[in-house]
């Protein structure tokens, strides 16, 4: 059985590149899409350890462009891999008039077009309930960290690596690891995977809690507003401790100007913080 299973893993070699076809595309909101890529057969799984991600590679205007993404599908899904990606269009952001190279390339892909996948990649592995393996860099040996409570700070599509862990941990009701998510977005419309996150928060209250903050909240908004602050972290995430790990994923300003300074201010040490 194990031999057959290995044969049906798509990402057999982390250095190889696997061309996968686009088989479905769904518009989630004005600038976010779900892209579904087909695996070599309906029985194949991607073969991605929980905590890891993939790279997509494409030749765009004679330049090799490589970007990292965490799928929202898992190895419970056969025959396909799903990515949720925000498209950075031209002339929207004054700092980036050209927009995103890879995201606009994906947006222009037609059904049946292929793109190269490479992986698994990553420094974090969810080994077994309450145990993470973490590499300090790509080449180092993974170190074991026992975790009772995972805090999560996510901005925009930075939710995808968090969702991977949330799904995996809540699937096992005997896993006592707690997770608390602080999820930052610009507007209410930008909150990705909201329905699923709120469902999990309701059905797995002993494992998962959820809090939002919005840059531009609507009137009557019940959650926080503005950039992530130390007070928000203090109120909604686990305090510093040996069995605490805070995971951070999102755009650079969220990480460098909000999450990291606030965490340091509250006394979280480097070994309590993991940034994707």
Curated annotation (Swiss-Prot):
Q: Which residues carry this modification: Phosphotyrosine?
A: 18
Which CDD domains does this entry report, sorted A to Z? cyt_b5_reduct_like
Q: List the SUPFAM superfamilies hit by this protein, alphabetically.
A: Ferredoxin reductase-like, C-terminal NADP-linked domain, Riboflavin synthase domain-like
Keyword Flavoprotein assigned = yes
- Reactions performed catalytically: 2 Fe(III)-[cytochrome b5] + NADH = 2 Fe(II)-[cytochrome b5] + NAD(+) + H(+)
Positions bearing N6-acetyllysine? 17
Q: Where does FAD bind?
A: 107-137, 146-181
Any one GO BP annotation for this protein: sterol biosynthetic process
| InterPro entries linked | CBR-like, Cbr1-like_FAD-bd_dom, FAD-bd_FR_type, Flavoprot_Pyr_Nucl_cyt_Rdtase, FNR_nucleotide-bd, OxRdtase_FAD/NAD-bd, Riboflavin_synthase-like_b-brl
Q: What is its EC number?
A: 1.6.2.2
Per UniProt, the keywords (alphabetical) are:
Acetylation, FAD, Flavoprotein, Lipid biosynthesis, Lipid metabolism, NAD, Oxidoreductase, Phosphoprotein, Steroid biosynthesis, Steroid metabolism, Sterol biosynthesis, Sterol metabolism
The record's top EC class is: oxidoreductase
The FAD-binding FR-type domain sits at 15-127
**Which cellular components does GO assign to this protein?**
endoplasmic reticulum membrane; membrane; mitochondrion
Q: Which residues form the signal peptide?
A: none
Q: Which GO terms describe its molecular function?
A: cytochrome-b5 reductase activity, acting on NAD(P)H; FAD binding
Tell me its cofactors.
FAD
Q: What does this protein do?
A: NADH-cytochrome b5 reductases are involved in desaturation and elongation of fatty acids, cholesterol biosynthesis, drug metabolism, and, in erythrocyte, methemoglobin reduction. Responsible for NADH-dependent lucigenin chemiluminescence in spermatozoa by reducing both lucigenin and 2-[4-iodophenyl]-3-[4-nitrophenyl]-5-[2,4-disulfophenyl]-2H tetrazolium monosodium salt (WST-1).
Task: Give the protein family.
Answer: Belongs to the flavoprotein pyridine nucleotide cytochrome reductase family.
Q: What is this protein called?
A: NADH-cytochrome b5 reductase 2
